[in-house]
């Protein structure tokens, strides 16, 4: 287990807004509806209440300041390898056994390669946050997947939809490779994508149609920390506040992406009618 002692950097972010807007504390207090006393308290203590975080970061976001996204760029310029994790209720510590067993690759600590990926997984939750971590993968045993049949079978296995096919030699070999690894690096599969995978697992669509539909997702890669050795390579950097306007923008973009995937699936069913079905692959 590693401890996570990150707080929102609101003191520094307030300083940035004051400078960028060329305003003083009194003007910021008027614009954000945060009292001068509260702003002074933030300068002294570096933290505040949930409602104040929301007022400040909503003000910044609605005035076109994309603080979190720009911080991602700056951190990636400073450090070579940076990963992001979205948490629904905040983190105090991280373990490799904290996730559900029916996640994409079983138990592990799941991270994405971008801030946007982490945001997308928690944008429905009012108290959610995103965390950034440094990560050094050298010397670790890494299992990599691309958008492939093996990737799809692995996720279907761990999410529990393969049924009798879960004991096939092909699937068992893939699972063995995952369980022996320190880190799994693979395309992200959200619930919209898993719906397509489950259609394949149930024999409703063939592998070619499924994979061509999934290739439209463009969610990027996830990193799954599977061992204590890999977990020790994570170094927490910062915690990011997710205000309501930013979460709503994210939700809207996910809805649009869902339309694209639905359209791609319908087109793929027409284009790839002769692909192999699961019973033919795992017979």
Stretches found by the model and what they are:
Residues 18, 29, 57:
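The alpha-helix within a helix-turn-helix
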Residues 139-283:
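Active-site and NAD+-binding cores of ADP-ribose-processing enzymes
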Residues 50-104, 255, 265, 274-283:
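ADP-ribose/NAD+-binding catalytic cleft of ART/PARP-like enzymes
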Residues 2-6, 67-73, 97-107, 113-176:
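ADP-ribosyltransferase catalytic core
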Residues 19, 33, 44-45:
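Residue-level detection of the helix-turn-helix DNA-binding "recognition helix"
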């Amino acid at each position: 287990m590693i401890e996570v002692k990150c707080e929102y950097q609101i003191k520094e972010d307030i300083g940035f807004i004051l400078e960028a807007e060329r305003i003083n504390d009194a003007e910021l207090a008027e614009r954000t509806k945060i009292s001068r006393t509260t702003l002074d308290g933030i300068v002294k203590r570096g933290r505040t209440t949930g409602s104040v975080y929301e007022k400040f970061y909503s003000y910044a976001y609605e005035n076109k300041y994309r603080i979190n996204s720009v911080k991602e760029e700056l951190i990636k310029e400073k450090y070579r390898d940076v990963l992001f994790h979205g948490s629904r209720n905040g983190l105090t510590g991280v373990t490799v056994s904290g996730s559900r067993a029916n996640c994409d690759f079983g138990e592990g600590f799941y991270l994405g390669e971008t801030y946007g990926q982490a945001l997308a997984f928690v944008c429905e939750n009012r108290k959610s946050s995103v965390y950034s971590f440094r990560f050094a993968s050298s010397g670790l045993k890494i299992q990599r997947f691309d958008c492939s049949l093996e990737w799809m079978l692995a996720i279907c296995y761990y999410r529990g939809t393969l049924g009798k096919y879960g004991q096939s030699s092909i699937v068992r070999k893939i699972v063995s490779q995952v369980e022996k690894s320190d880190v799994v690096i693979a395309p992200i599969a959200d619930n919209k994508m898993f719906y397509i995978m489950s259609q394949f697992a149930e024999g409703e669509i063939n592998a070619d149609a499924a994979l061509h539909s999934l290739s439209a997702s463009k969610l990027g890669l996830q990193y799954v920390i599977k061992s204590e050795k890999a977990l020790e390579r994570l170094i927490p950097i910062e915690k990011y506040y997710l205000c309501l306007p930013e979460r709503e923008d994210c939700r809207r973009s996910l809805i649009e992406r869902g339309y694209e995937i639905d359209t791609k699936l319908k087109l793929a069913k027409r284009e790839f009618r002769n692909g192999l079905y699961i019973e033919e692959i795992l017979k």
